[in-house]
């Protein structure tokens, strides 16, 4: 008895025109604006808008990436979106959300003024010192001094770059595996 042969999948890899761009713009813009609104809300309520609490809004970015990839797959049915389109919509969504969030960080820093940025520096410095107190043997004295100096000289550009990278990495963490999974 011969082993059954499997027919190759002959469905076309086809995505509706402009679907990748449209979905990425919609979800990337929405997630980026949600990050900015969250930071502004934190700042307006007396919390540090640049601090660790902003991660709560940044967690929306991976969800937006997955939603854009899911809707792309749905829009392409009965065809497949393909690997390029599926990864492309996810990466573009994450890039757009990260860019909007970083620009929002700069805008908030200039809008809130130097006292808010100085407060953020002081909070980060306290976190760094607390980490060093917890494990004094792990870090050399010169590395400690260098880290403290970097925190003391933190600029708005450094904060925006950090925000951009955090949001981008969070988005890409799910964009790649989900894009591969949803391509077919």
Where are each of the predicted segments found?
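Transmembrane alpha-helical insertion/packing segments
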Residues: 2-75
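Alpha-helical transmembrane segments of multi-pass membrane proteins
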Residues: 22, 26, 30, 88-97
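Alpha-helical transmembrane segments of multipass membrane proteins
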Residues: 34-38, 42, 61-65, 97-101, ...
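Membrane-helix interface/capping segments
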Residues: 71-85
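Membrane-interface capping segments at transmembrane-helix boundaries
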Residues: 74, 182-184
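Functional transmembrane-helix hotspots
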Residues: 103-134
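Short membrane-interface loop/juxtamembrane segments of multi-pass integral membrane proteins
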Residues: 128-155
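Individual transmembrane alpha-helix segments
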Residues: 145-172
